Amino acid sequence: MKKIKVYPVILSGGSGTRLWPWSRKNYPKQYLNIIGENTLSKTLSRISSIKGNFFLMQNPIVVTNEDQRFLALDNSITYIKNTKIILEPTGKNTAPSLYLASLYAKDMNKTDEDSVLIVLSADHWIKNESYFNKSIINSIKLALLDKVVIMGVLPVNPNTGYGYIEMAEKKREGRINYNKVLAFHEKPSIKKAKKYLEEGNYLWNAGIFSLKNEIWLNLFNKFEKSNAELINNSWKKKIFDNHFARPNKNDFDKVKPNSIDYAVIEKIQNCKYELAVLSLKCGWSDLGTWGAIKEINHLDKHNNYIKGEVVSIDNVNSHIMSLDKKMIGAMGLKDIVVISTNDAILVANNSKLDDLKILLKGIGKKNKSLLNDHRKVFRPWGWYDELDSGDKFKTKRIHVKPKSSLSLQSHMFRSEHWVVIKGKATIFLDNKKFILKENESTFIPKKSKHRLVNNENKMLEIIEVQTGNNLSESDIKRFDDVYGRKSK
């Protein structure tokens, strides 16, 4: 019997602002070590492990944005050796993202109309993976019967942070039990959420879907015709760049944002395709809030979640995390969240966390960079940590991965001093090439062409001291870059 091809689609473009200061725009929650490893890697390993006798799981398709491309690549390459990561030119919500992925899947599988998409978010936590995998296999079976399958989670509390699915009558296909969908409901008030919990026929909308690729293409073209035309044109003009697929920006910028639910799923009841909901009972969270992080972790006898360098005395129902090496001393707190990073601290009452975006607006007015980047900034070649800065100087600790290099570049307004702390550096400076070992240093004059290379099999660490009138990251002129980056 011919096996069906199944394409997992991982949507990984979110910013995770509700987990500030841990999650930032350029290093959002799907790349954080929340559950022992980052959730993108965990999602990829989980879906890649699913096997069945009637289908072939294909390489996952990751959809993200330009700013996160190297983060996505670094965390995908273990599981996806030959895939393309689709880079949206601009964020347009989840429906256009999925349509791009479906066009890619169609290109990979032009002769088979029965291929199935499994749509997943990159930032979900699953407790019982065996049960989850069985649910995914059941969803594939239902999708092959031309059903559009959505996963719901049985509520364990009156959560106001999720949309809800109202279930209709129970149905059965073979050994698979599912429900028809009666209605979708927006994130409710606490009063409504309690009502949903009491009535028992509501599920949290987990945002996990399974359906035939051809059905998604047809539905999107039916309900989002103008967007479909623009995305089709954008995809036709795409550029492949190593692991990345870049749709045309001019066409894609004209696309109107819309979610999968609003654009298509909530309109399916008027179509020939049955909308089926499977109940997930495997332990699930979208890790979208500090409350959600607390819920999945071990709590002490006073209902506190404590992590890192923390001394906690007489605290109740609080969440205290030291995410750097700072010691936090906390005493007599009740219903309080304290999150410490190396450049920002959040202190809030549990009841005010839904208003975090108001606080972030104020922080953005004072120091916008705190919303975008950590002090430790990741690059395709490694990372740097800004240790100190002041009038006309900046000090960085720079780590370069094995067999990696920075771009050949120059700076108009700054000079640099490099000291090797660990490893061996190969330096290109104008027409010279030389080696620096541990405890050796060099000076990089402004306007000189230079490049830092690690040809070794272990990490290279240097301390860089910048001096000059303009120490901005925009003061980089690139002459050659192995990662395809251009000067800002």
Residue ranges and their predicted role:
Residues I126-K254, K272:
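Conserved core of the sugar-phosphate nucleotidyltransferase
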Residues G91-P96, N157-N159, I190-K192, W284-S285, ...:
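A short acidic, often aromatic-flanked loop/helix-cap motif at beta-alpha or helix-coil junctions
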Residues L40, A101, D123, I165, ...:
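Residue-level signal for inorganic ion chemistry
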Residues L11, L120, V420, V465:
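Catalytic metal- and UDP-sugar-binding loop of GT-A-like glycosyltransferases, i.e.
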Residues I4-V6, M57-Q58, K81-N82, D112-S115, ...:
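Short coil/turn connectors at secondary-structure junctions
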Residues M1-K5, E214-F443, S448-H450, N454-N455, ...:
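Left-handed beta-helix
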Residues I462:
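Noncatalytic nucleic-acid binding interfaces
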Residues M1-I10, T17-P28, L32-S121, W125-Y131, ...:
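Conserved N-terminal catalytic core of the sugar/cofactor nucleotidyltransferase
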